[in-house]
C-alpha cells in the first residue's frame, strides 16, 4: 500500500530530477493513478488515449517522447502493444 512516506519519496525523486519536465510529471502521475486504480498491480494495462486524456496531452509525438524518456531514466518499463485489440502494459519501477 502506498503510504504518505512512499508518496513523499516518489514526489521528491521526480521533482529533484532536472531531466524531467512538467509533461513527464503529468504522464507519470496519470500512470500512478492508473496503477492505483488497477489495485497496485505491476504490470498493468493502459491505453494511449486514456493516459493522454488524464495528463491533458494533445500531441502523440510528445506523449511517445516523454514515455520513452521515462523508460530511459528508469521510472517505468513500457511494453507497447501494436495490436488495436490488446493494451500496452506499464511496470512502475521502484514503486514499493
Tell me what each language-model feature is.
Residues 36-96:
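Winged helix-turn-helix DNA-binding recognition segment
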Amino acid at each position: 500500500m502506498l503510504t504518505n512516506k512512499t508518496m513523499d519519496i516518489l514526489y521528491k525523486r521526480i521533482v529533484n530530477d532536472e531531466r524531467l519536465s512538467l509533461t513527464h510529471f503529468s504522464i507519470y502521475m496519470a500512470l500512478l493513478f492508473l496503477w492505483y486504480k488497477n489495485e497496485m498491480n505491476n504490470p498493468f494495462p493502459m491505453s494511449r488515449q486514456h493516459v493522454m486524456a488524464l495528463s491533458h496531452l494533445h500531441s502523440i509525438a510528445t506523449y511517445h517522447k516523454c514515455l520513452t524518456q521515462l523508460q530511459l531514466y528508469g521510472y517505468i518499463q513500457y511494453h507497447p502493444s501494436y495490436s488495436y485489440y490488446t493494451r500496452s502494459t506499464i511496470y512502475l519501477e521502484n514503486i514499493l
